[in-house]
């Protein structure tokens, strides 16, 4: 059965030794298996990665890899149609699949007693799937995937990706079409096309199986052998060869977007594929140019020219090709020539100053600590082992690759700048609001694109459950029709020990000791959010929180504060919500005291930098304007207006309104901070390998200097209005989908019935195993997903059900929503309740 076995111990990250022990072996049919034991939690993750993605497709048959991923969730010979959704839910687990340009992956994370059942399920769709494919099932999934594509395209910049690919890649290049493909290609797919794709790419020799988590290795090997070893092998397909893009000239293109309210510019320079020796210095080059307040592109485009709220520049490397790219959405009515020129001014400034060695060191530290974060769950660890094995044959590649990043020098960075960026041809795509061609980069030509219209929409499948044709069973050495029992190692519900202390200034602190990784996670929660903002100063809580992070301190400029955190590899954020204000962060255990000193400076002595204030205000105003451009946000705002009223904070959210934010001053923020930033209305939560004594010692400055004060907690009326039973329509011209939301006022999280409501909603619309999803997607194909939920807030309470549906299916979708929700009480049974409680207990 086994061709070879190897055990490797991997070490990475000098901040603290981190090891992943794994065993890799290969079955006779070519399936590569990787086992990683992690007993820290009683769960197990199973993942399979096939080396096939959209890059393996042909012109005229695009979208097949992603479409096939969908098909594998339908059924197999021994799994009834759509049972994958219900079985994983009943085990208290989670699952999904994903398709990239270069691979397709499936995963499950379940309590440890579900391992054998999951292996049975995965092996069944690997080796016992293809005979079950029917024309009806094919057509239903074509409808679902078509609506997934429409959902992405029905909003601002939804077509920008297709425009970019057409003009960046040469015709026929493996990356020249989107992963989801073209709707006309999907609608022309046949059962024979699916079978051909399966036989070529879904062979064991083209796959890697990873099991990571709490399991017995010997038993796992027996299960893998039992369920996978007999699957017929086949030749391993040749991987798609590297095909780097070369541009004979710079190309400039524009596309008029009927939904966009602000221009967007994408620029890309051809570079190299993943794992190429130049990809590592290119990663740091991009960060040095655009990452951080002191980077040249940020300084010029954001601070000096004030063209956008943020910028970025990234080395985007995949298996076949790579690029250094940026996508920036500007403020409304910005001429994209001005942004385009900023890039070249930034390049010039970078050349003049050279590589900032301190910044390079910070970026290396951040990358290294980020590796620890990628070791935080069995699923992420399994994914890293999968990718390394699929593309290099080395499961530990992500860890050994660390040395490639750490060894990058300033000379390497300047070399790749000269080789790939300076004076090189590139592609620029300007996506501009319809009718504003003058905002496009000068010299751009109009993109020649054709997209599906509403008149062209069609539904391939017939409504109702897919009728399954009889099929021939594939012979097996075991009885695969029998669903395996759960293993005997069912985990007990084990709530971690939580310690509590109240500091002398009144701050309540709760914590959990966790030594799995050398990181500490912390969160300050201030019981004061937008719900307490005066109506005329709506948004003051949110803007104050943003200024704590962006405005520096009394002794540090905004740039110095950002760099001080970055020196420790710490990630710190501050933001306001409707009901609370949050300051969250993570850092190495050993740096916690130093990071707390910086956090104390933020909380107690904000810098109130005026330039940072103006930028923060402009950023929030930009967010408010953008929130008025998508179907979902427009519908949600209308729903909340009906529920709460036009000027209510729950309608407008934590940002406030354009009028109130424009009127806010620095004095308003200082006044808010002075009145409400008190430890008496704050709490702190912390998880890491630190004792309460160590934490208290690290926070001594904050404890000493953060003085308690009395706080006025009066606020707005929090009761929703009595809603009439009406249907409201909002026109969103030309959209290929309709967004539906319906609901009413809900329960407070403090209400005794709030948890019961969550249990009741579980089967209605909480997940892909619920009734709304089952009927609107799986049985009708009208949508990519349909869900419902109760908001979990103390005051901002509502129940809502929602979905983005095919435009031509709007009326029947609304009728189905009303029918399902209205009749839910009549079909809800004691058995459904017991199954829900059982799965929710297991999931916890």
Question: Across the structure, where does each feature detected by a protein language model lie?
Answer:
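Sec-dependent signal peptide recognition
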Residues: 1-5
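Proteolytic maturation boundary segments
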Residues: 8-32, 216-257, 264, 299, ...
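M16 family metallopeptidases and their MPP-like homologs
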Residues: 36, 41-57, 63-67, 82-128, ...
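Metal-associated gating/positioning segment near the N- to mid-region
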Residues: 71-79, 86
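Non-catalytic, conformational "gating/processing" segments within enzyme and secreted inhibitor domains
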Residues: 135, 142, 195-227, 425, ...
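Short, conserved secondary-structure transition motifs
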Residues: 145-152, 243-256, 363-374, 587-588, ...
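Alpha-helical scaffold elements lining the catalytic groove of polysaccharide deacetylases
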Residues: 185-190, 194, 660-664, 669
């Amino acid at each position: 059965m086994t061709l070879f076995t190897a055990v490797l111990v991997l070490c990475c990250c000098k901040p603290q030794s981190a090891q992943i022990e794994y065993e890799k072996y290969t079955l006779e049919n070519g399936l590569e298996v990787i086992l990683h034991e992690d007993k820290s939690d009683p769960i197990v993750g199973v993942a399979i990665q096939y080396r096939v993605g959209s890059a393996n497709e042909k012109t005229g048959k695009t979208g097949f890899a992603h479409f096939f991923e969908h098909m594998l969730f339908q059924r197999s010979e021994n799994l009834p149609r759509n049972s994958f959704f219900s079985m994983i839910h009943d085990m208290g687990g989670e699952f999904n699949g994903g398709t990239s340009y270069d691979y397709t992956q499936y995963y499950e994370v379940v309590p440890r007693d579900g391992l054998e059942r999951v292996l049975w399920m995965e092996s069944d769709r690997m080796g016992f799937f293809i005979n079950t494919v029917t024309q009806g099932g094919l057509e239903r999934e074509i409808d679902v995937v078509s609506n997934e594509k429409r959902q992405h395209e029905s909003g601002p910049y939804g077509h920008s990706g297709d425009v970019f690919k057409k003009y960046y890649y040469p015709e026929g290049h493996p990356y020249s079409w989107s992963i989801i493909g073209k709707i006309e290609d999907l609608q022309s797919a046949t059962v024979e096309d699916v079978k051909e794709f399966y036989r070529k790419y879904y062979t064991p020799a083209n796959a890697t199986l990873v099991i990571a988590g709490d399991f017995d290795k010997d038993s796992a090997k027996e299960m893998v052998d039992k369920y996978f070893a007999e699957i017929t092998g086949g030749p391993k397909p040749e991987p798609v060869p590297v095909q780097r893009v070369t541009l004979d000239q710079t190309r400039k293109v524009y596309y008029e977007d009927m939904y966009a309210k602000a221009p967007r510019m994408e620029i890309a320079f051809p570079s190299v594929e993943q794992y190429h020796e130049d990809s590592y210095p290119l990663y740091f080059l991009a960060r040095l140019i655009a990452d951080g307040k002191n980077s040249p592109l940020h300084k010029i485009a954001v601070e000096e020219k004030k063209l956008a709220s943020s910028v970025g520049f990234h080395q985007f490397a995949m298996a076949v090709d790579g690029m250094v790219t940026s996508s920036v959405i500007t403020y409304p009515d910005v001429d994209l020539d001005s942004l385009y020129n900023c890039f070249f001014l930034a390049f010039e400034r970078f050349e003049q100053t050279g590589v900032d060695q301190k910044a390079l060191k910070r970026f290396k530290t951040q990358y290294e600590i980020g590796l620890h974060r990628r070791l935080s769950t069995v699923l992420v660890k399994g994914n890293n082992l999968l990718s390394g094995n699929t593309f290099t044959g080395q499961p530990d590649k992500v860890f050994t690759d660390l040395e490639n990043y750490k060894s990058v020098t300033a000379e390497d960075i300047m070399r790749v700048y000269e080789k790939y960026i300076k004076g090189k041809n590139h592609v620029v795509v300007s996506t501009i609001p319809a009718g504003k061609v003058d905002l496009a980069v000068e010299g751009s030509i109009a993109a020649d694109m054709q997209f599906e219209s509403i008149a062209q929409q069609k539904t391939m499948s017939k409504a109702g459950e897919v009728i399954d044709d009889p099929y021939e069973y594939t012979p097996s050495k075991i009885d695969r029709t029998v669903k395996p029992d759960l293993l005997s190692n069912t985990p007990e519900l084990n709530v971690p020990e939580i310690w509590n202390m109240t500091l002398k200034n009144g701050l309540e602190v709760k914590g959990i000791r966790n030594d799995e990784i050398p990181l500490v996670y912390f969160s300050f929660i201030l019981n004061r959010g937008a719900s307490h903002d005066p109506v005329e100063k709506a948004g003051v809580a949110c803007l104050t929180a943003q200024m704590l992070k962006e405005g520096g301190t009394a002794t540090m400029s905004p740039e110095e504060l950002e760099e001080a955190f970055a020196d420790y590899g710490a990630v710190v954020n501050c933001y306001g919500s409707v009901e609370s204000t949050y300051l969250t962060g993570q850092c190495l255990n050993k740096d916690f005291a130093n990071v707390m000193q910086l956090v104390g400076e933020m909380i107690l002595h904000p810098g109130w930098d005026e330039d940072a204030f103006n930028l923060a205000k402009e950023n929030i105003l930009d967010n408010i304007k953008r929130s008025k451009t998508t179907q979902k946000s427009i519908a949600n705002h209308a729903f909340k207006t009906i529920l709460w009223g036009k000027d209510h904070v729950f309608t407008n959210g934590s940002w406030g309104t354009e009028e109130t934010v424009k009127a806010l001053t620095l004095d308003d923020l200082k006044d808010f901070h002075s009145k409400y930033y008190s430890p008496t209305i704050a709490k702190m939560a912390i998880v890491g390998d630190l004792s309460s004594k160590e934490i208290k010692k690290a926070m001594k400055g904050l404890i000493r200097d953060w003085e308690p004060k009395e706080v006025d907690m009066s606020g707005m009326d929090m009761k929703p209005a009595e809603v009439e039973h009406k249907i409201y329509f909002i026109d969103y011209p030309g959209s290929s989908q309709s967004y539906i939301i319906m609901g009413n006022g809900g329960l407070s999280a403090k209400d005794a019935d709030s948890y019961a409501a969550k249990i009741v909603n579980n089967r209605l619309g909480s997940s892909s195993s619920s009734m709304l999803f089952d009927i609107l997607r799986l049985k009708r194909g009208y949508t990519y997903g349909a869900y419902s939920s109760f908001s979990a807030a103390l005051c901002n309470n509502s129940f809502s059900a929602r979905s983005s549906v095919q435009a031509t299916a709007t009326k029947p979708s609304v009728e189905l929503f009303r029918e399902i929700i209205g009749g839910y009480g009549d079909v809800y049974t004691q058995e459904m309740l017991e199954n829900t409680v059982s799965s929710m207990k297991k999931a916890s």
